[in-house]
Amino acid sequence: MYLDEYKKWLDSTMLSEDEKEELRSIANDEKEIENSFYTNLSFGTAGMRGVRGIGKNRMNKYNIRKATQGLANYIIEATGETGKKKGVAIAYDSRLDSVENAINTAMTLAGNGIKVYLFEGIRSTPELSFAVRELKAQAGVMITASHNPKEYNGYKVYWEDGAQIVDPQATGIVSAVEAVDIFNGVKLMDEKEAIEKGLLVYVGEKLDDRFIEEVKKNAINPDVENKDKIKIVYSPLHGVAARPVERILKEMGYTSVYPVKEQEQPDGNFPTCDYANPEDTSVFKLSTELADKVGAEICIANDPDGDRVGLAVLDNNGKWFFPNGNQIGILFAEYILNHKKNIPANGTMITTVVSTPLFDTIVKKNGKKALRVLTGFKYIGEKIRQFENKDLDGTFLFGFEESIGYLVGTHVRDKDAVVASMIIAEMATTFKNNGSSIYNEIIKIYEKYGWRLETTIPITKKGKDGLEEIQKIMKSMREKTHTEIAGIKVKEYRDYQKGVEDLPKSDVIQIVLEDETYLTVRPSGTEPKIKFYISVVDSDKKVAEEKLAKLEKEFLNYAENL
C-alpha cells in the first residue's frame, strides 16, 4: 500500500524534479518510505503537525494546500460571502519552510476568493490570535510547530473569536480537509493577481502596536516601583518573541534586560539547542551563564512561536532553580488573587485536567471559581467565549496549562508568552521590593496550602511502530485496571474516552489513589510521545518528595507491565 503511494507521488507531474530526487534518495530505505506514506498526515482538531519532507505523511506544500482548501471549503459552506469578505489572518514563525507554507496557505485561500491578511514577516502565535480579533477576520492560520524539534512544522487553525477551533468548526473542517484530493482538488492564485483583486493584504507594524497596547493593559500593578533594579536575562530560543517581549519590558520600564545574543536571532535550525523547549532546563545554559556574569536573578525563555514561557530563578543558596509549569501556574494564581484590584465576585481561573490539583485549592480558598477543561488551550479560549456570551457565569482572570502556557487577559484567546513575561517581571520586582523572591514565594505557597509536587515523564515513540506502541499502552491501561498501585489503593479510575463530567471525550486516563495521588496518562496531541503525569501531596516536604520518587518508578513499571 505505502509502496504504491510512494510510486504515485514519484510519478506525479505535480512534483518538481528536486522533490522527486528527494523521494529517489529514500528508494532503498523501506522503513522511511513506510513512515512517509503509510497514512495521510493527520489534520486533527488541533490542526496539523509533522516532520518536514515529501510524502503524504509529511509536512510539505501539498499537505498545506490540501488543508487550506478544506478550510476554504468549510468557510464558504458555513459562512458564505460574509466569511469570504471577513477573510483569514495568517502568521508564521521562524521555522524552516514557514514562509513558503504561509504563502501557499495565502495563495490557496485567494484562489477560493477568500480575503487574506498576511503578516509581512515572522510573528508570534498570540499576535496571530490577536490579529484575528482585531481585523474581525473569519479565521486565522498560524504556521508553527511550537517547541517541536527542527525537523517539524505545523499548521494551526483559529476561528473568529481568536481561539483555536473547537466543535462544531473542528469536526467540520477536519471532514472538509479529508475530502480534498491533494493534487487535483486545490485552487491556487498567484500573488500578483491576489493583490490586484484585493484578496491579499500585507499587515504588520500597526497590528504590532495595537497588540503591545492591549498587552500592557493586563499588568496587575503597572506602577510597581524599582523596575530598574531587577536584572533579567531573556532568550527567545531562536524564535519570534524577541521583538515583542523585549519591547514590552522596555516600555513597561524594565531597563536592565540582558538578551542572550547567541539565541536572539530567529533561526529555524535552533543552532544552540536541539530542542527549543523552555520546559527543558538544558536550554537555560547560556542564559544562566550570562546571568551569573551580569548578576541577574531571573532568566526568562520563550519557545520559538512565543506562546510559552519558562523560568530559571535563584534559590536562597544562589543556585539556579527551574520552576516547572505547575509551579509557575500556581505562582500566577496566588499573585493575581492577592494583588489584582476589583476582582468581580464571579472571577474564574481555568486550567486543564492534567495540571496540579493545588490550583483548585488556591483559587477556591481565595473565594473564586476554578474550572477544569481538557488539555489544549482552545478549551480555555472556549470558556472565555462562553463567559462573554453569558452562556456560562464567570469573568476570566487567568488560565494555564502545565506545559508552561499562560494567559492573563482576554486580548488573545491562546496562551501568550508576551503578557506572561511582562507579569513575571512585575512579580519578580514586587517580591524583591518585599524582601522576597520568586523562589521564596513558591515555597510559601507550599507551606500555606500543602506540598503538592508533580512530575511529567514524556516517552518518545517515533513513526508507525511508535504510534502502535502508544495505542497498545492506552488499550492495556483500559483493559487491565488494578485495585492498587505502589501499594496504595485506587480510589477512582477516570477514562475520559468514556466521558467524565461534562467534558468532551478524550484519550486520557486518570487514576486517583486513596492518598490523593493523581496518575494521568495521555498521548501527546502534537508530538510522537506518550506522557505520564504524577502528582502527590503531603503536609511534609520530605515525605512528598520521597512519595514522588517512589511513584515515578512504580507508575512507569505499572504501565510497562500491563
Please tell me what each predicted stretch does.
Residues 37-57, 145-148, 232, 236-248, ...:
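Conserved phosphate/anionic-ligand binding catalytic regions in large, soluble enzymes, centered on
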Residues 120-181, 277-301, 330-336, 348-359, ...:
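Phosphate/diphosphate-binding loops
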Residues 6-105, 193-195, 200-230, 240:
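An N-terminal, well-structured beta->alpha segment
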Residues 32-37, 41, 153-283, 290-291:
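Gly/Ser/Thr-enriched, mixed-charge loops and adjacent short helices
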Residues 81, 89-152, 250, 255-310:
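N-terminal small/polar loop signature for handling phosphorylated ligands or for N-terminal nucleophile
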Residues 296-298, 321, 339-522, 529-533, ...:
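Phosphate-binding and adjacent anionic-ligand microenvironments
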Residues 101-109, 152-159, 307-328, 359:
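Short Gly/Thr/Asp-enriched flexible loops that form oxyanion-binding sites at enzyme active sites
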